[in-house]
UniProtKB/Swiss-Prot annotation:
Name of encoding gene: mutL
Protein name listed in UniProt: DNA mismatch repair protein MutL
PROSITE patterns given in the database record: DNA_MISMATCH_REPAIR_1 (PS00058)
Swiss-Prot/TrEMBL keywords: DNA damage, DNA repair
Residue ranges of the TM segments: none
A Gene Ontology cellular-component term: mismatch repair complex
Listed HAMAP family: DNA_mis_repair (MF_00149)
Amino acid sequence: MIIRHLSENIINQIAAGEVIERPANVVKELVENAIDAEATRIEIVTTNGGKNFIRVSDNGCGIPADQLTLAVSRHCTSKITDDVHNICFLGFRGEALPSIGSVAKLKLTSRTQNAESAAEIIVTAGKIVGPKPAAANPGTIVEVRDLFFVTPARLKFMKTDRAETNSITDMIKRIAIAFPHIHFSLSGSDRTSLELPATANNTQGQLQRITQIMGKEFAPNSIVLNAERESVRLTGFACLPSFNRSNSLHQFAYVNGRPVRDKFLWGAIRGAYADVMTRDRYPVSILFIDLPPADVDVNVHPTKADVRFRDPGFIRGLIVGAIREALHHTGVRSTSTRSEAMLAAFQTQKPLKTFKSTYKPSSYSPQPYHVESASMVNKPLDIISPVGLKEDAPPLMEGLDIPSGDAYTPNTPAASEECSYPLGAARAQIHKNYIIAQTQDSLIIVDQHAAHERLVYEALKNALYSKPLPSQLLLIPEIVELSEEDATCLLTHKDALQKFGLGIEAFGPGAIVVRETPSLLGEINVEALIKDLADEAAEYDTTDNLKTMLDYVAATMACHGSIRSGRLLHPEEMNALLRQIEATPNTGTCNHGRPTYIELKLADIERLFGRK
């Protein structure tokens, strides 16, 4: 077999296969070139999902007529010279235009801001014609026709026109979020599908642009991020855990303004939400990471979608710390989306049919619910046990450094102050699972199981950094058979598990004896618990992942040790639960990311009844 030089055209087609996989890649490369040219308005037109026609026009600085030939030649660029480690532009390789021209019909028309006329050049399957004079406004227009007509086999891998159009739209949205000061317009054969007017290039402008793309529900459910450590700055928005999605399509990350889809960053975001969201849900977040160009390598993938950080551990720590700190300082807050959904669910009922009433007055006169004093509203939750209602049950949070409701004791009678708490005063319990509370201007519905599950979980986590949880000695220690590897792995975490109140010891090869279990959990299936913990320990058998494992252990214990649905609560218990929710961090959601409560404003209730 003879080794030979490939022709320039074949080389370009091979390069195009790496850079241009589908129409969305063409649009991405052309839009990035327009942004690098300092355009403030970019218009995109496509037909048939970009397979037949793509046009990207901008009002940027333009390309001089004598440089058009270089613009469509490989490895010719104005953005870098010899320093490939200090890249400040979105594009830099000089591959996009020649790659497109080698597999499609390309026409490039451009005019600089000071030129009297424009010029155009045409590239068809790698063959260049021009440049020649043309008529156009200052800026650049790139038209691409019959994509992959040179390699028709590639067309078989294209998706439907609708799917390709959706891919282009998603890509434009991701770029537009990072550049709110640029006007973006995307249209198809017969209509404009996306119109994003320019906004201010600041945090408020970014939020306005994000609202244009994500919808009006994003802003009230988001938290502003602003953290800086050494030479790295993290800004953006992290949404409440209860405002989540079933996939990662609503996670956006930008490194020095470049949109990226990097698994490392997705993992850092999931790590930040690990103990407030279930594993099968994805948080909504938008992160902007700005750091010196020399500290990140953007030249690791042909499409520049992946990046490599010089110190990935530092970046992960910054992301996780900033998001968790922001969530911690949100206080008692849950998503507003479900409240809006509840409002939408109410429909004006049709008038009831007239019927002859058989009602007879009753002598019964119901007594209104009334709390005797503020101390009752603020009474600690001291009779809730994980295994049932017991008169002599110890306080739920006894021995743990969890803030109690005592800090909220008012000095005035409860009649005037009971509704001033963030979650108000309990008025009723319905279906033995939902607490109805009243504030000064709203109605609160609390899921007692979800709320108490979060309280127990936070108490368990708190035990890791303070005194251990109380435990109960088993009358007959239980022996659990495991594989020798699992037993050894679990025993390495013996001290950490002891803080949870779980006492284990080795009992020969491949066996563990359990002598103590957490008092908080009551009666449990010890064998099932140990085997689950062994699986968690095997999955996270590193020092870095120990905390993750312990968080999952705490979450599992909390779910089994919290108030169950169907449990009847007294008014004192309900009010004490509300006070503990207010005094405990991260109580807007349970361990699985579900909301612990929803709020319905009085104005919304009045609107439902036509009063406003």
